[in-house]
Amino acid sequence: VYPNGLGNPSGWDNGIGTANPHTADDVGFLTALMDKVSRNHKIDQRRIFFCGFSAGAIMSYRMGASLGDRIAAIGIASGTVGFTLPNGQVATIPQPVRPLPVIAFHGKKDTHIYYNGGGLRANDLSVADSIRFWLNADNCDSTPQVTTLQNGNVTRDGYHKCKQGADVVLYSFANGTHEFPSLQNNDNFSATDAMWEFFVRHPMP
């Protein structure tokens, strides 16, 4: 199911983004969408997953945190869990309702949501900050199992000692930009396949 964020500017009410929370309730919208699809189709309720790119990635982070009692795992491409406000306060997605498996992908040359934080539109939290957010939520050992692929161009950090088997996995792309990793772009890596393999191993406990 492929919902799309609308508005001007287009986006999602992800709790940290551009949508107006007084006119948009996208957590409610996506919850209603799950309900409708479940009524109209035979859905395995233990295998409902969310994934997204950029603003959709941030919305998937938000849904995983808020609806973890219904969502089994999330997949993230070029997202962040929050940003630093001008007054120095940090705005993030809500604290997750349960330990949640997360797989994330991010290019180190992303010029929209910077890998190391900052960025064009706001002082986004870094990829390391976002992963740390989930390591804390999932009560994971902070030492990853590191694997390099494609002659060192892709690095996989796997955190597998987590509460309730809620693994956290990060793929970093040395030459990756603000894009969904695929076999058709510079990453030469299928995030779709990696995400699905992760989802298959992580149904709702």
State what each model feature region is.
Residues K42-D44, C51, G56, S66-D69, ...:
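Extracellular/periplasmic catalytic domains that process cell-envelope and extracellular macromolecules
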Residues L100, L135-P205:
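Alpha/beta-hydrolase-fold serine-hydrolase catalytic core, especially in secreted/extracellular enzymes
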Residues V1-N4, R47-G52, I58-Y61, A72-S78, ...:
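Structural recognition of the beta-strand scaffold that forms the well-ordered cores
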Residues L33-N40, C51, M63-R70, A77, ...:
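Structured segments of extracytoplasmic/periplasmic soluble domains
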Residues P9-G11, F83, T111-Y114, E179-P181:
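Short catalytic/ligand-binding loop motif for oxyanion handling, primarily in non-cytosolic enzymes
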Residues A72-A73, S78-V154, Y159-Q164:
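The feature captures the conserved acid-bearing segment of alpha/beta-hydrolase catalytic domains
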Residues V1-F49, F53, I58-R62, S66, ...:
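Serine-hydrolase catalytic machinery in alpha/beta-hydrolase-like enzymes
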Residues F29-A32, D129, F133, S190, ...:
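Alpha-helical elements of Rossmann-like donor-binding domains used by nucleotide-donor carbohydrate transfer enzymes
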